[in-house]
Amino acid sequence: MVSGSGIAAKRVVVDARHHMLGRLASIVAKELLNGQKVVIVRSEEICISGGLVRQKMKYLRFLRKRMNTKPSHGPIHCAPSKIFWRTVRGMIPHKTKRGEHALARLKVYEGIPPPFDKQKRLVVPDALKVLRLQKGHKYCLLGQLSSEVGWNYYDTIKELEKKRKERSQVVYERKKQLNKLRVKAEQVAQEKLGSQLDILAPVKY
């Protein structure tokens, strides 16, 4: 994803792990308005500056808005994907046709569901915690905050992510072994061909 200048691809998959919520949302909102399709994965690991207790109290005050007919059915969802989606919506003129179409180009997920687990994932340097948050400053994860205010799937997502990482490690080890065998085969072939490679070198074969 190219921030602020042009469309990089048909669809960009962004790994949101350890990105700052507001900074990532502002960059994504700008890209959506430029026509870019964006998929956000691992939204439960987005960071918010400030300690967990402070953020929980702020969010609970925000969640006090309820329906009169059914108080448990408030207008605000507590899942990390919905919190990020709502943050981006606040940065887009979503009541216009342009804003409505821009918001439709955004997909947000907890964890990394198929088929995005096998696709190349990008990061946004301008929103990374390690570059944007001062050293020693408190922060909390969006998944932790959501689990404190009513989201029930934090442990489920962590378990699914653990299984996905185990599968990825098996694939990586297999690929590394195949690369070793390929390098060894190339060395054996070079030793066998020897002088023939010197003849083929001038014609760039």
UniProtKB/Swiss-Prot annotation:
GO terms for cellular component: cytosolic large ribosomal subunit. Disulfide bonds: none annotated. Keywords: Ribonucleoprotein, Ribosomal protein. The keyword Lipid biosynthesis does not apply. GO terms for biological process: negative regulation of translation; translation. Belongs to the universal ribosomal protein uL13 family. NCBIfam families: L13_A_E (TIGR01077). This is Large ribosomal subunit protein uL13. It comes from Lupinus luteus. The lineage of its organism: Eukaryota, Viridiplantae, Streptophyta, Embryophyta, Tracheophyta.
